[in-house]
Amino acid sequence: NDQVLYNMSRAYEEVGRVEEAMAVMTRIVKEYPRSKYLDEVQFRRGEYFFTRKKYIDAEEAYKSIVDLGPVSTYYEIALYKLGWSLYKQELYDEAQARFVGVLDYRVTTGYDFDKGGSDIERKRVDDTFRVISLGFSNTGGPNTVVDFFSKHGKRPYEVNIYSNLGDHYLEKRRYADAAASYQTFVKRNPLHRIAPDFDMR
């Protein structure tokens, strides 16, 4: 049954027999699609594929967890890694939607973007903002941020997106692009409490 196979896959992994572990995990996925181990097994498969740059296979494994929804304890990390799998395939728009999904999930948990949470939470959120900045800088900068949120709806953390994008450009010494990022936010949100700070940059 699935528990026997699951234990077998763990045993193989612990002694470094990764290929055998993968073969067993693939059996679990095919033969026991309702297994209670499915999300963990799919996450381990996703990590295997991702580290070997098999991003399409990784995407498929992570997506199967995301499709389960927040009921899975692997949901958030799978959503994040799904974003990266798409990003590595240069599917920037699809990747952005997944990374924004990570931030949306954080909103539902009551995460405070100003104060942050635990070190692990803050690191993942910071990394998510960083890769979102990379994605928007690859696809046209602040105007693509405007387009994205016009299409997908406003978010409470939009200010962080613009701020991180501006900071990303500053690090690259792209000063005009940095200024455009801050000014675009101010233009769209003139009454936001951060707007005066952005206006001075």
Task: Locate each region found by the language model.
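Acidic, polar-rich low-complexity tracts and alpha-helical solenoid repeat scaffolds
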Residues: 1-201
